[in-house]
Amino acid sequence: MQKVKLPLTVDPIKDAQRRLDYVGYYAANQLERLAESVVNVLSDAQVTLSFYVDPQKLVVMKGKVQIDVDLECQRCNEPYKQTLECEFTYSPVANWDQADDLPEIYEPIEFNEFGEIDLIGTVEDELILALPLVPMHSSEHCEVSAQEQVFGVLPEELAKKPNPFAVLANLKQK
Protein backbone atom coordinates (compact mmCIF):
# COMPACT_ATOMS: atom_id res chain seq x y z
CA MET A 1 0.00 0.00 0.00
CA GLN A 2 1.33 3.41 -0.98
CA LYS A 3 2.04 5.98 1.73
CA VAL A 4 0.12 9.20 1.07
CA LYS A 5 0.82 12.54 2.72
CA LEU A 6 -2.33 14.08 4.14
CA PRO A 7 -3.37 17.68 3.43
CA LEU A 8 -2.67 20.35 6.05
CA THR A 9 -6.25 21.67 5.92
CA VAL A 10 -9.52 20.23 4.65
CA ASP A 11 -13.00 21.49 3.86
CA PRO A 12 -15.07 19.20 6.09
CA ILE A 13 -18.44 20.09 4.52
CA LYS A 14 -17.34 19.13 1.00
CA ASP A 15 -15.54 16.05 2.27
CA ALA A 16 -18.58 14.93 4.29
CA GLN A 17 -20.91 15.39 1.32
CA ARG A 18 -18.57 13.17 -0.71
CA ARG A 19 -18.14 10.74 2.24
CA LEU A 20 -14.37 10.92 1.81
CA ASP A 21 -11.95 8.73 3.72
CA TYR A 22 -8.29 9.60 4.14
CA VAL A 23 -5.58 7.10 4.99
CA GLY A 24 -2.11 8.56 5.14
CA TYR A 25 0.54 10.09 7.30
CA TYR A 26 2.12 13.26 8.58
CA ALA A 27 5.92 13.23 8.60
CA ALA A 28 7.59 13.38 12.01
CA ASN A 29 9.27 16.70 11.14
CA GLN A 30 5.83 18.30 10.57
CA LEU A 31 4.79 17.66 14.20
CA GLU A 32 6.89 20.38 15.84
CA ARG A 33 4.79 20.86 18.99
CA LEU A 34 4.75 17.12 19.65
CA ALA A 35 8.53 16.98 19.13
CA GLU A 36 8.93 19.66 21.84
CA SER A 37 6.91 17.52 24.27
CA VAL A 38 8.83 14.25 23.85
CA VAL A 39 12.45 13.11 23.76
CA ASN A 40 12.22 11.96 20.15
CA VAL A 41 9.58 11.29 17.49
CA LEU A 42 10.40 7.84 16.12
CA SER A 43 7.88 7.42 13.31
CA ASP A 44 5.48 9.27 11.08
CA ALA A 45 1.93 9.76 12.39
CA GLN A 46 -0.33 7.17 10.73
CA VAL A 47 -3.77 8.76 10.33
CA THR A 48 -7.15 7.40 9.23
CA LEU A 49 -10.02 9.88 8.76
CA SER A 50 -13.65 9.56 7.68
CA PHE A 51 -15.95 12.44 6.85
CA TYR A 52 -19.72 11.96 6.73
CA VAL A 53 -23.08 13.55 7.51
CA ASP A 54 -24.84 11.93 10.47
CA PRO A 55 -28.64 11.34 10.76
CA GLN A 56 -29.03 14.74 12.46
CA LYS A 57 -27.48 16.37 9.36
CA LEU A 58 -24.30 17.27 11.25
CA VAL A 59 -20.94 17.12 9.51
CA VAL A 60 -18.69 14.64 11.31
CA MET A 61 -14.95 13.97 11.14
CA LYS A 62 -13.97 10.69 12.79
CA GLY A 63 -10.38 9.57 12.98
CA LYS A 64 -7.59 7.49 14.45
CA VAL A 65 -3.92 8.33 14.78
CA GLN A 66 -0.89 6.32 15.88
CA ILE A 67 2.76 7.30 16.34
CA ASP A 68 5.86 5.99 18.14
CA VAL A 69 7.78 8.38 20.40
CA ASP A 70 10.55 8.25 22.98
CA LEU A 71 9.53 9.56 26.41
CA GLU A 72 11.70 10.14 29.48
CA CYS A 73 10.88 7.81 32.37
CA GLN A 74 10.21 9.90 35.47
CA ARG A 75 11.63 7.19 37.76
CA CYS A 76 15.01 6.52 36.14
CA ASN A 77 15.30 9.45 33.67
CA GLU A 78 16.05 7.05 30.80
CA PRO A 79 14.20 7.26 27.47
CA TYR A 80 11.77 4.53 26.49
CA LYS A 81 9.59 3.85 23.46
CA GLN A 82 5.85 4.52 23.73
CA THR A 83 3.18 4.09 21.07
CA LEU A 84 0.56 6.84 21.23
CA GLU A 85 -2.85 5.90 19.86
CA CYS A 86 -6.01 7.94 19.97
CA GLU A 87 -9.44 8.13 18.39
CA PHE A 88 -11.49 11.29 17.99
CA THR A 89 -14.82 12.49 16.65
CA TYR A 90 -15.32 16.14 15.73
CA SER A 91 -18.13 18.19 14.29
CA PRO A 92 -17.11 21.54 12.77
CA VAL A 93 -18.83 24.72 13.91
CA ALA A 94 -18.71 28.26 12.53
CA ASN A 95 -18.37 29.75 16.03
CA TRP A 96 -18.20 28.53 19.60
CA ASP A 97 -21.83 29.49 20.28
CA GLN A 98 -22.88 26.60 18.03
CA ALA A 99 -20.76 24.19 20.07
CA ASP A 100 -23.37 24.14 22.84
CA ASP A 101 -25.92 22.67 20.42
CA LEU A 102 -23.76 19.66 19.50
CA PRO A 103 -24.46 16.22 20.96
CA GLU A 104 -21.93 15.24 23.62
CA ILE A 105 -20.43 12.50 21.46
CA TYR A 106 -18.89 15.17 19.19
CA GLU A 107 -16.11 17.57 20.03
CA PRO A 108 -16.52 20.97 18.39
CA ILE A 109 -13.84 22.23 16.03
CA GLU A 110 -13.95 25.73 14.56
CA PHE A 111 -13.63 26.57 10.87
CA ASN A 112 -10.96 29.05 9.80
CA GLU A 113 -11.79 32.07 7.63
CA PHE A 114 -11.79 29.87 4.49
CA GLY A 115 -14.29 27.32 5.83
CA GLU A 116 -11.54 24.77 6.44
CA ILE A 117 -10.15 23.09 9.52
CA ASP A 118 -6.48 22.81 10.45
CA LEU A 119 -6.14 19.05 10.10
CA ILE A 120 -2.47 18.72 11.05
CA GLY A 121 -2.97 20.96 14.10
CA THR A 122 -5.96 18.89 15.21
CA VAL A 123 -4.06 15.60 14.83
CA GLU A 124 -1.10 17.05 16.72
CA ASP A 125 -3.39 18.29 19.52
CA GLU A 126 -4.84 14.80 19.88
CA LEU A 127 -1.37 13.26 20.10
CA ILE A 128 -0.27 15.77 22.75
CA LEU A 129 -3.41 14.99 24.76
CA ALA A 130 -2.59 11.26 24.48
CA LEU A 131 0.78 11.74 26.21
CA PRO A 132 0.86 10.17 29.68
CA LEU A 133 0.83 12.61 32.60
CA VAL A 134 3.78 10.84 34.23
CA PRO A 135 5.73 8.82 31.68
CA MET A 136 7.28 5.69 33.21
CA HIS A 137 8.66 2.34 32.09
CA SER A 138 6.70 -0.65 33.25
CA SER A 139 8.16 -1.62 36.65
CA GLU A 140 9.89 -4.76 35.29
CA HIS A 141 11.77 -2.69 32.68
CA CYS A 142 12.71 0.27 34.88
CA GLU A 143 16.26 0.52 36.26
CA VAL A 144 14.99 1.92 39.57
CA SER A 145 13.87 -0.93 41.82
CA ALA A 146 10.96 -0.70 44.25
CA GLN A 147 13.45 -0.82 47.17
CA GLU A 148 15.10 2.39 45.92
CA GLN A 149 11.82 4.27 45.72
CA VAL A 150 10.47 6.25 48.68
CA PHE A 151 6.74 6.02 49.34
CA GLY A 152 5.74 8.43 52.13
CA VAL A 153 8.41 7.58 54.74
CA LEU A 154 11.78 9.32 54.55
CA PRO A 155 14.92 7.22 55.00
CA GLU A 156 16.85 8.02 58.18
CA GLU A 157 19.75 9.72 56.36
CA LEU A 158 17.31 12.19 54.77
CA ALA A 159 15.38 12.76 57.99
CA LYS A 160 18.59 13.69 59.88
CA LYS A 161 19.58 16.48 57.48
CA PRO A 162 19.24 19.97 58.99
CA ASN A 163 16.19 21.94 57.96
CA PRO A 164 17.27 24.72 55.56
CA PHE A 165 14.48 26.94 56.89
CA ALA A 166 15.78 26.83 60.48
CA VAL A 167 17.72 30.04 59.71
CA LEU A 168 14.43 31.80 59.01
CA ALA A 169 13.06 30.69 62.37
CA ASN A 170 16.06 32.36 64.05
CA LEU A 171 15.37 35.61 62.17
CA LYS A 172 11.72 35.50 63.23
CA GLN A 173 12.71 35.29 66.92
CA LYS A 174 14.84 38.47 66.72
UniProtKB/Swiss-Prot annotation:
It comes from the Bacteria. InterPro entries: YceD (IPR003772), YceD_bac (IPR039255). Keywords: Ribosome biogenesis. One of its GO terms (cellular component) is cytosol. One of its GO terms (biological process) is ribosome biogenesis. It holds the Pfam family YceD. Belongs to the DUF177 domain family. NCBIfam families: PRK11193.1. Plays a role in synthesis, processing and/or stability of 23S rRNA. This is Large ribosomal RNA subunit accumulation protein YceD. It comes from Haemophilus influenzae (strain ATCC 51907 / DSM 11121 / KW20 / Rd). The lineage of its organism: Bacteria, Pseudomonadati, Pseudomonadota, Gammaproteobacteria, Pasteurellales. The gene is yceD.
